[in-house]
Amino acid sequence: MRNHVSRYLTALIAVGCAATTAACTSLPSNSEPQALRSFEASASEEPQGPVEDQEPDLLLRDFYEANNNPQQRYSLARRYLTHRASQSWNPAPETLVLDGIEINSAADSSTKNRRYDVRGLIVGSIGEGGEYRPRNERYSTTIGLEKVDGQWRISTLPDQIVVQRNELWNHYRQKQVYFFDTSGTTLVADRRWIFQEKMGHNDNHESALLSLILTGPSKSLAPGVVNEVPSGAAYAGYHDDYYQFTGLSSLDEDSLKRLTAQSVWTLALAEVPGPYRFKFDGATMKSPINGSEDLTVDDFAEYNPLPQQAVDSGLYAFNSNGVKKLNQGVATPTTGTLGNTHNIESMAVSAKTGATAAVRTAVEGDAKTSTLMLGPIGGQFVDVLKARRLTSPSFELSSSSLWVVKDSDQVVRLSRSSENEGIVETVVDTSELGSLGKNISALQLSRSGVRAAFIVDGSVYTATVARPNPGQRKLVNVQEIIPSLANVAQSLAWQPNGSLIIGTSKPDAPVWIVAQDGSLGSKLSAGNIVAPVMNVAASQSTLYISDARAALELPNSDTSTTYWREVQGLEGSRSVLVVPR
């Protein structure tokens, strides 16, 4: 019954997440990990326990290698401990991710007892359910070893799992679990780190994903999404061709439909073969379209979390000569207000409706002023907001509202009034930003509108968009997404796959791609780029930047290319590219 039928699975693999047939488990967890996906056994050079007569420093390094395997409460790692240490060791649920592990012998070591100072830079941590959080702090501890029957074993150690970043990528995979935003209309990706197990069972992949849905969203995302699953709900396994759940009797019909849609899209985008059948407390879920028990993403197409490019949404560019539309290397000036405006500083276009927002600048006396105007491409625009400085506007998914930062310290949301067709301005609550809210130079909403990325004093942060009350918005769970780029970030944009493209002032690393959760930051080729990179944009196929001299592009499929190509139709001019989104 599980025929893999979906036209939606041809795009959007997350940064650094290659397709794999490995089995996986979500980590860390206080319970026994669940296997994700069968794996064909192969020879492994990884240590399976202490090597006889191994030197203590080498044994300690192998112990940290064994930290990557959480099965049976880290039973492999416990083999490196003395019996007493193994009995008392109780690792915390949080796993620390270090850039590297430095091991040095302590001064008070002896022939029978050794002590080692272990240091490193903490770049992130993985919490329960596999949520990654970026960090930037030093790690330091001391490990004691003693001889047991002539063999070195670890006798004293902290209750903490520590892994190296490169080993994280070798032993874990990233999977997306989907939850609805607070409106109940948009699915939002929740990225989790999953342990890649070397042995598994046929249905473990689905089991882990569906269990994560029932467990609920990650802590950082939770304020921006809804979790309608009651606390007593459980996944009962795959039996008689059905995924079976219990404890859902309190949910109404609409809630059950949303849970089914979550499950279908999570399984489908994890490449679990469909169609899918579900039983909730013994009741069979059926297609809302044709009543079939065999469900696919087509039955819930209205919740498709993948970006849908509108017909003729196009590609635009602007410079001192106004706005142009690009088509197959030809730049054609637009008509209306934009075609005649020569002082545009930033611009955004909704791929869904074609609604357009642009910021134009002017010098009045000794002061610069910025004006936000709204209208359709090719039509007449109206002024809606004026300030000393305005960041590039960013539309919400519906395009009926947009965000902009006013004078670097006030985030405002502009919405069309349902009563009089006017524009309503509300201030976004940024109280959790503290001092970070005083000098915001860029802010962009993710496609779903549940996340915001912004730049403060050259550092990049993300936050979750909460809705405390109707019409209100608040930025919560603020975190610096990539501390290594502190003080150099100039521009940012969300890619269709949920990662960020960031332009910087660093000549040797002017453009970066950063994973949604900050777990990976990859610098792209500096090639022929002249920093700083003041504008960035991304379509499903191409990355665009504007450096100090020109508009350049690079295929998304080949980011290893050394040189960026000047955008055809814009040669010889410094232009800014605008991708409708």
From Swiss-Prot:
It holds the Pfam family Germane. A lipid is attached at residue 24 (S-diacylglycerol cysteine). It is a lipid-anchor. Keywords: Cell membrane, Lipoprotein, Membrane, Palmitate, Signal. It comes from the Bacteria. InterPro entries: GerMN, Lipoprotein_LpqB, Lipoprotein_LpqB_C. It is found in: Cell membrane. GO terms for cellular component: plasma membrane. The keyword Cell membrane applies. Residues 1-23 form the signal peptide. The keyword Cell membrane applies. A lipid is attached at residue 24 (N-palmitoyl cysteine). Belongs to the LpqB lipoprotein family. This is Lipoprotein LpqB.
